[in-house]
Structures are given as C-alpha cells and as structure tokens.
C-alpha cells in the first residue's frame, strides 16, 4: 500500500452542499470555490516550502562535500607540483605510525528511519490512532522484552535479517578456519612443471643435424628437466657404469664423443664438489723420469675417478677440494706395528695412515713419499725418508694423524671388475668422547694431542671432526684436563632492577594483549542496525584469506 506523502486539501473546489435559506446560490458557490482555491494555494505553498527546504539542505551538504574535496585536491596539487625530491618530508616512522584514512561523511543507509521521516508523513502518523498502552506491562516481564513489541514491532524484519546475516558470516569464518587447518595438515605438494608440446618440426631439425648433435640436445633437455624437477637418481648410474668397467668394452675410447664429454664433465663435477677429499701429496721425480698419472681412490664412495690422458702432456689433472678430511676412527691399543703393516698389505680392511715422524723430524723437513715403483705397498712406504734436495712445499703440521682417504700416486693399471666392486667399505665414524671430557674444550684437545715423550704417538689421539686442531704449545701453557668446573655461585647474580624490568615487560605484554582483546570486542559491539556495515563485513569475510578481523576495516571507511 503506497503512503501519501503530501495531500493537498481540499480536493474538490465546487463539490459542496449549499445551505438552505440562501437566496443567491450562484454567489455562494463562487465564494466557496474561491475559498477552496485559496486553501489549496496555501497547502501548495506549504509543501513547496518543504520541497525547497529539502533541496536546500541537499544542495548545502553537496556544496560542503565539494568544497572539502576541492581543498584536499589543492593541498595535493601543491605538494605534488612543489615537491623537492632531495628532501624527505615524510619519514618512514611517520608512515608506519600514521593511521589509515577514515571518512567522516555519514551515508544515508537507513531510509525508513524515524529520524529520516518527512514532516508530512509525521503529520499523517500523528493523525492516526495510538496503539494500546502495552508498555505499562514491560516492568512486570521476566524476559526483559518490551510489551509493545508483541503487538507492533517495526524493526522485526530487519532484526531477523540481521541475525541471519551475522550467523552466515560466523559460519563462513568457521569454514575458512577448518579449511586452513586442513591445508596445514596436508603436506605441501611440489610444483609440477607442465609438459612441453610435441613439436615434430624440431625433431626433424635435430635429425638433420646428425645423431651426435641430436643426442647432445637430448642430454641438454634432461639437464633442464633435472634443474626444474630436482635431481634424479637414474641419471647418475650411467657414468658410474662406464667408470667401473674401464677395462671392458665400455672404455672411453669406445664411447662416442658426446657421451665421453658428458662423462668427463660429470666426473669432474664429482671431484670438484666433494668436500671431504684430502689434497694429493706432491709427486717427487727427476727431470727425465716419466711422471705417473694420479688416480684418486675414494674409500667413501667406492668409485674410481679417472680421466683420459691429454695428448699434449700425457697427464690428467685432478682437482680436489682443499677442505681438510675427517679424522680416522681410533684403533685398539692391542695392535702393533707389524699387525698394522700386515693389515695395510691386505685388501679387505680399509687403509690405515702411516704414523707421523717425531716432532723434530717433522719440523726439519716435510714427510713426502718417494715415487712408488711396484704395485704393492712396500714396508718403507710407512716410514719414508725425506729427500735432501726437495724444498718444503707445505708448512709443517703438528704430529696429528692424517685422514685415511688420502690420494696415493700409483701407476694406472686397468683393475678387474671384481677388484673394483670389492673395494673396502668406508670407515665407521669416530666414537663419542667419554662423558667427563667436553669435545668443545680446546684445552682438553691440546692435552690429549701430546702424549708423553716415552710413548709412541698413535693415530687414535685425533680429535673429533668438530674439534679444531691446535698447534703444539709449550709445556708451561698446557693446562691439565682435570680442571675443576666453575661453581654456579661465581656467575653474576641478576640484580633486582633487571628482575623488575623483566616483570614490567611481561606486564606490558599482558596489558597490550588485554587492550587488543578489548578493541576487538568493541569492534564487535560497534555493529548496529547498519545494512551497509553488515553486508561489507560479510563480503570481507568471504574474500579474506586470513582469520583475522580485517573485515572491520571496511566499517571504518563507511563511517
């Protein structure tokens, strides 16, 4: 049913009943019509004043908004045109401390409110009959509801809609929280690289170049796939097969050029990347002697790194990382020198490094092994004599046992397949130190690294891989390992000022949490009968990725 906003009275100018006893009826009708016209003109003038008053108010608010916008534009234009790029007018701290912009314009969201009720409708409402006085019964109700709302409640439908919207918003937030929890529990899937489309023209171009170049392109494609999807295990097995069967039909001379170059590149990468490989000993030979080709045998991987001889020099350069090797495991004390030599000549056990010379000999000249003539390790190799002419290439090191995987220079002979596969396994890791010794203490390491002069030093005195090796120090600086630990009472006691400061910091953190909680509760309580606020809150919950109450920022912009 439409509501009549303005009603012009009287409707009918001449439609009136003439009273009895009037002699001149025509004059009476004329006077009544003129009076009704005047009444209509008065009502029209009144409504015109209402209409123009509303227009004036709208124009005034519009002009105020336009003027404020013009002032902001003028300020921005001045700051933009006269901005000096060399001067920093706004610091980073001001940017972070400044609050977000909040509009102060009140939007007309509730059109049918008592405050926005027009004056003619208010007059019409006042003419209507009053509802029954049910508010008298409100103090006697136990549920606290108004008695008149059971008879008439203008906000019933809006309250019903608001309750439904808020419930839907809360349900969506719970659903998002459950979905996020499922995503956290689910393991992260690796990104898949899409498969390239099949191109027949490129295949024909590869075949036109030749089988060798086509194979190189295929290897390059495999490398690109390996870089994109991670290293694969089956790409590394083929070069190892060629290396393990050097004496068979898979030798380097029988391979095509593309496979040979790929094999050499991979072998060089493996040699350069290994961090625990020790540097090879410097070769000793005369001017006219033929230099042996170094072949590095690694006990940690069980592979033979080999490179073909270059036609110019007849040697193969092997690049090894200069990182120090890990120390060998300790040997039992019951082993003697003869058993050590016997175990060195046998194949199954891992090679044991030779014991270092005395400190005096080590300081005079470095221990450089002579060029080995036979294949088997002679007894003299364990205790080599330093040559008188060779200058020291490396600084003398303290009498600490060298690591087991040392690259020895031996003549290159093709090893049978059985010997290559039967290489000894890598040595086990060194045992942990006893509970009374701290591995991180350099004093204990120094005391252990220098045994008494009467005893022969053994390789078992090497520290763990995480303990740094220290040069020998004078006896006056050596502190015994049985040093008493510091008592906890010698540590500085925390003063009362520090404890008070820590307690104040904790209280400040708790107060900050309470303030944030109160702010969130105030934001929840601030939502009133505002349609735009409720809708914006629901939209923010639907399109937000986080569980925070970031949807309340939309409310600030609408206020």
Swiss-Prot record:
InterPro entries named in the record: SCAR/WAVE_fam, WH2_dom
Biased composition, class Basic and acidic residues, residue ranges: 182-202
Regions of compositional bias (Polar residues) in chain numbering: 304-313
MF GO annotations: actin binding; Arp2/3 complex binding; protein kinase A regulatory subunit binding
CDD domains from the UniProt entry: WH2_WAVE-1
UniProt keyword list: Actin-binding, Cell junction, Cytoplasm, Cytoskeleton, Methylation, Phosphoprotein, Synapse
Residue spans of biased composition, Pro residues class: 322-332, 347-360, 423-437, 460-477
Pfam family, one: WH2
Compositional bias annotation for Low complexity: 333-346
All residue ranges annotated as the WH2 domain in the record: 497-514
Modified residues (Omega-N-methylarginine): 341
Residues modified to Phosphoserine: 489
Any one Gene Ontology BP term: positive regulation of Arp2/3 complex-mediated actin nucleation
Modified residues annotated as Asymmetric dimethylarginine in this record: 341
Entry's localization field: Cytoplasm, Cytoskeleton; Synapse; Cell junction, Focal adhesion
One cellular-component annotation, GO: cytoskeleton
Keyword Phosphoprotein: yes
Disordered: annotated segments: 170-202, 304-383, 412-490
Record comment regarding domains: Binds the Arp2/3 complex through the C-terminal region and actin through verprolin homology (VPH) domain.
Subunit structure: Component of the WAVE1 complex composed of ABI2, CYFIP1 or CYFIP2, BRK1, NCKAP1 and WASF1/WAVE1. Within the complex, a heterodimer containing NCKAP1 and CYFIP1 interacts with a heterotrimer formed by WAVE1, ABI2 and BRK1. CYFIP2 binds to activated RAC1 which causes the complex to dissociate, releasing activated WASF1. The complex can also be activated by NCK1. Binds actin and the Arp2/3 complex. Interacts with BAIAP2. Interacts with SHANK3; the interaction mediates the association of SHANK3 with the WAVE1 complex. Interacts with ABI1 (via N-terminus).
Family recorded in the similarity comment: Belongs to the SCAR/WAVE family.
Protein role: Downstream effector molecule involved in the transmission of signals from tyrosine kinase receptors and small GTPases to the actin cytoskeleton. Promotes formation of actin filaments. Part of the WAVE complex that regulates lamellipodia formation. The WAVE complex regulates actin filament reorganization via its interaction with the Arp2/3 complex. As component of the WAVE1 complex, required for BDNF-NTRK2 endocytic trafficking and signaling from early endosomes. Also involved in the regulation of mitochondrial dynamics.
Protein name per its UniProtKB record: Actin-binding protein WASF1
Species: Pongo abelii (Sumatran orangutan)
